């Protein structure tokens, strides 16, 4: 089992998109009330006094859409300023990125992942649940802005959904040929979207690799990061292709992370809901940070068993939260 030193932090559960695989249409989303979110001070206190002392040094800010969080720049500055912080990154839908890229970089953010599942504006609107003016160009502009500012590596997350965007695999992969971008194909997961998943199913990473390999060939490669992606490269390309295969290829033995939701629940495994700790309520009820630290240490010890023994029940069970509420 890997050393667990990577914490994914959901700053907010709200998002200005409603992507099919994250916040499915028709699903009732009970948004967290403002007073139930971890405050800036609570989050920073947990990081400084609980997570860093037990070995967490790498942090990723997620959502919902993290750029909707008030004072997100200030939070980034504070987390980046911790001497123990080795890596600070973010996953965003890119909608606000063209306006904020420079400030994010200046605050100390150095790596960024941007979600873009299609190069077609109509398909984009379908995926994000948008019935008004297309936002595709704004996201594309955000990607360009992040690249120009200097985020490196710049990664683009792609979820392939059968019958929706699976015809674009080669076009998306081709973005890496002349650009130092890193496209990551993520297998579609049944978390909070059972109806869509049952209707559409999913495409394995190996199937995607075969499509790309037939066109250009593929060689193994490497790109810095904390994730479980298997990295490949089109021969001669500037960028790389990553494949995250949580459905088809168990990588529990490589898991190095936990997830902290916007309302303070610490989740040891994405694939099931066993072992979660409500850190926010404990903190507000006067439980000392020393005791919380002990609880997190204990959960770290249980994580291998949770990962492996509960994997099957997790991928077939009922989830009480959508991906947006978990933090991805």
From Swiss-Prot:
Pathway: Cofactor biosynthesis; molybdopterin biosynthesis
GO molecular function: 4 iron, 4 sulfur cluster binding; cyclic pyranopterin monophosphate synthase activity; GTP 3',8'-cyclase activity; GTP binding; metal ion binding; S-adenosyl-L-methionine binding
Cofactor(s) essential for the protein: [4Fe-4S] cluster
Catalysed reaction equations from the record: GTP + AH2 + S-adenosyl-L-methionine = (8S)-3',8-cyclo-7,8-dihydroguanosine 5'-triphosphate + 5'-deoxyadenosine + L-methionine + A + H(+)
Positions contributing to [4Fe-4S] cluster 2 binding: 252, 255, 269
InterPro entries with a match to the protein in the record: Aldolase_TIM, Elp3/MiaA/NifB-like_rSAM, MoaA, MoaA_NifB_PqqE_Fe-S-bd_CS, MoaA_twitch, MoCo_biosynth_MoaA/MoaC, rSAM
EC nos: 4.1.99.22
Membership in a protein family: Belongs to the radical SAM superfamily. MoaA family.
Protein's recorded name: GTP 3',8-cyclase
Native source species: Trichodesmium erythraeum (strain IMS101)
Gene field: moaA
